[in-house]
Each structure stands twice: as C-alpha cells, then as structure tokens.
Amino acid sequence: MSEEKQIEKPRAVKLVYNLNDDYRTPRYLVSCLDTFIFDFMQRHNVNRKLVVYCPFDTEESEYVRYFKENGAEVIHGDIKTGQDFFENPIPECDLVISNPPFSRKREVFSKLFAAGIPFALLMNLQAMQYQEMGQLFFEEQQRTEAIQFIIPDKKVSFDGHTSAFCSGYYCWKFVEKTSFVHLPHNNSGKFYVPAYSLTKQGDVQ
C-alpha cells in the first residue's frame, strides 16, 4: 500500500482565528486600567505621549478609541484588515494592551516575552493553569520576572448574557503586583452596554 501524501494547508487557513476568539471588549474593561497606566508612566518617567500598541484591534475597538480619547498615541492592527501580529515585527511602543485570540495565546505571549515589551492582555484566567501556559510563565519567571494579574471582581459579559468564564489581565513588566479592581456590574441584562464597534455595525440594537 502506497503511503498517502499529506496535503499542506494553505498559509492563510492556518492564520484564521477561531470564530469564538472574536470578543468585543466592553469599555469599562478598558477604563479600569487608568490607575495602572498612570502608575506605569510615573515609575518609568514617561513625560511624553504614551505609545500603546493594540495588535488585535480595528480603529473602532474600545481600546483604540479610549486610549486616543485620553491622549495616547495608538498603533493598532488586525489580521482581518491585513495587519498580522504573528508575521510582522512589533512596532516601537511603551505598552501592548489588547484582547488577543485565545486559540493562539501561547504564540502571543511567546512573541511578547521575546520582544521584552510590557503588556496587559485580557484573557480567560483559567488559561494560566493550562500545562503549556503554566510552563511558559514559569520559565519566563525564572528568566526575567513573573506574570502579575489585574482581576475584575465580577465575571464580565461580552454579549449581554451571563459569562461562563472569568477574565482578567495578564500583565508583565506593567504592574508591580497582582490587584483586584471593582466593577459596578457584570455588563449583562439591563446593565449591558455593547462595545462601540458592535453598536456601529448594527450587530446589537
């Protein structure tokens, strides 16, 4: 019997994110970083406009809109608009802040660790105990410094329904210690406010 030849998947197919990765971050999960960003700028003597890189965001992302409204210089890109974080070099910046694709989480963290750039990435907190992630974080802790967390005191909904998972920010070289932040509600039911990009596109009335 002849050996069946493996067919290589086209490159573009490999880069497509899982549809479940596309969660639009509500604004109050962005604004809750204010105090931490101020402290970061103080510690690092940033006396100019802060440069924030949002690698998984279009111009209508709440990250991009909020940071621009508050005086930061924002560099953003998204694979759907032709800017591929995994293929392109990281631009010069002070901070990387975004809600990355969960299906490629290890690649995201590995690239940022290698670049040495401080970051705050919003993600399911359970991922820290996935074997491949825990090992990556432990090895980086041995090499440089440990991951810290900014943890909301509520499960946050991204679509108006009760959230099934706990999300928070994985931080590296951004905050000095793990902290909890208070949120006024969990963004579900009568408190639900869709991300700007959803409202603008008409996905949510």
What annotation goes with each model-predicted range?
Residues 1-205:
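Class I S-adenosyl-L-methionine-dependent methyltransferase catalytic core
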